[in-house]
């Protein structure tokens, strides 16, 4: 008769959780940041608020964003005027959009990841679905299972309403699932649609305007598993260590509340200061066991909450400008896509590393860090190891 410890050992994988594929998707509607203030104030019938528009123009100019992708087109907004007012009851209209669009966009990203993975979708054992865009029962995880035609006994985990740090959370969960379940193949999907947060401008709620200047729509997917099948599965990154912490004295720094008017966001001005003040401690905990204290010697994937956060982290750690290249590139080309951002950055990094003829997926370096920042203020830390190209 086998013992419990023997059963447990047999259930576990041998090697570390490995990212085996990455896929991304965006809505077709591309919005240029340079012309967005004109569009935004026109569609929300706020052109008379000239001083506020000038403030918003400055926010957009300083955002370091060139373009974003949005499900909400001019036609959709004209058909749903309640979304264009500030704090008008509009949750039903928003929910009707996102309960369809979030799984649909997630499917686009997942199909690309599954294609790169090269294995039949019947080998997917677990699904993690993450979104801050609306809620529903059964959830977006269920809808995606149906859209992809996954097996009904895939083990699903639905993450609703976590915010921007959740891009790091999905790595932590996928790592635990892959390493503790032999032969597990975890499909991870983050899908975010700003139809829940779009609203007209307000003179009294400028942090709402910050969100209107930064947020974009996107979905990204990973396939994660331990012990890759030789010749069939091609590792991209290994996940070595993860942590989550709440920054001290940060209550109320980033809040989101789902109300009749949709999802409202509240930001304190000093979010960049809180992040930069706490990042050193997170790095020491993560990299001291590896004997690494030079943070220019690792590759960087940081959630781009906004340019000020990246600037202050760079300054605090004396990082070379190229360390945040992939992060800034994604911010510039897509805006802040909440949880999906760090997956996009990972994809950008491995592609650019190959294009530049570097010898690893992590810009030619072996070790790297992935950070998620969001409500709480919560910080997710993931230590990654690159793979030889």
UniProtKB/Swiss-Prot annotation:
InterPro entries assigned: Chalcone/stilbene_synt_C, Chalcone/stilbene_synt_N, Chalcone/stilbene_synthase_AS, Polyketide_synthase_type-III, Thiolase-like
The active site lies at 164
Record field: catalytic activity: (E)-4-coumaroyl-CoA + 3 malonyl-CoA + 3 H(+) = 2',4,4',6'-tetrahydroxychalcone + 3 CO2 + 4 CoA
Q: Which PROSITE patterns match?
A: CHALCONE_SYNTH
Name the UniProt key words of this record, in alphabetical order: Acyltransferase, Flavonoid biosynthesis, Transferase
The Enzyme Commission number assigned here is 2.3.1.74
Q: Name one GO biological process term.
A: polyketide biosynthetic process
Q: Which GO terms describe its molecular function?
A: naringenin-chalcone synthase activity
From the UniProt record, give the pathway where this protein acts. Secondary metabolite biosynthesis; flavonoid biosynthesis
Protein family according to the UniProt entry: Belongs to the thiolase-like superfamily. Chalcone/stilbene synthases family.
Protein's job: The primary product of this enzyme is 4,2',4',6'-tetrahydroxychalcone (also termed naringenin-chalcone or chalcone) which can under specific conditions spontaneously isomerize into naringenin.
Q: What is this protein called?
A: Chalcone synthase 2
Tell me the organism: Pisum sativum (Garden pea)
Q: Give the classification, highest ranks.
A: Eukaryota, Viridiplantae, Streptophyta, Embryophyta, Tracheophyta
């Amino acid at each position: 008769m086998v013992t419990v410890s023997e059963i447990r050992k047999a259930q576990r994988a041998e090697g570390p959780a490995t990212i085996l594929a990455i896929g991304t998707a965006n809505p077709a509607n591309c919005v240029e940041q340079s012309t967005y203030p004109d569009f935004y104030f026109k569609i929300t019938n706020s052109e008379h608020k000239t001083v506020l528009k000038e403030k918003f123009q400055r926010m957009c100019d300083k955002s370091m964003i060139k373009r974003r992708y949005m499900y909400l087109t001019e036609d959709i907004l004209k058909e749903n005027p309640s979304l264009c007012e500030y704090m008008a009851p509009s949750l039903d209209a928003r929910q009707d959009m996102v309960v369809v669009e979030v799984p649909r966009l997630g499917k686009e990203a997942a199909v690309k990841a599954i294609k790169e993975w090269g294995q039949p979708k019947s080998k997917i054992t677990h699904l993690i679905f993450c979104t801050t865009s609306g809620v529903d029962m059964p959830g977006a995880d269920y809808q995606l299972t149906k859209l992809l035609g996954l097996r009904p006994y895939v083990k699903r985990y639905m993450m609703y309403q976590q915010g921007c740090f959740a891009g790091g959370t999905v790595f932590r969960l996928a790592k635990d699932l892959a390493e503790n379940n032999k032969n597990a193949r975890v499909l991870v999907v983050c899908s975010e649609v700003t139809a829940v947060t779009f609203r007209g401008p307000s003179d009294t709620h400028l942090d709402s305007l910050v969100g209107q200047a930064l947020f974009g729509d996107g979905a990204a997917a990973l396939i994660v598993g331990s012990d890759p099948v030789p010749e069939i599965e091609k590792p991209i990154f290994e996940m070595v260590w993860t942590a989550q912490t709440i920054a001290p004295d940060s209550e109320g720094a980033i809040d989101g509340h789902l109300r009749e008017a949709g999802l409202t966001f509240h930001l304190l001005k000093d979010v960049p200061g809180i992040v930069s003040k706490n990042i050193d401690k997170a790095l020491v905990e993560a990299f001291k066991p590896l004997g690494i204290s030079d943070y220019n010697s690792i590759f960087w994937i940081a959630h781009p909450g906004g340019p000020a956060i990246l600037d202050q982290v760079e300054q605090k750690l004396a990082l070379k400008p190229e360390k945040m290249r992939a992060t800034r590139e994604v911010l510039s080309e897509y805006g802040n896509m909440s949880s999906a951002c760090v997956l996009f950055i990972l994809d950008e990094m491995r592609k650019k590393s190959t294009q530049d003829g570097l010898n690893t997926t992590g810009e030619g370096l072996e070790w790297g860090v992935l950070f998620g920042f969001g409500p709480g203020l919560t910080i997710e830390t993931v230590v990654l190891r690159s793979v030889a190209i």
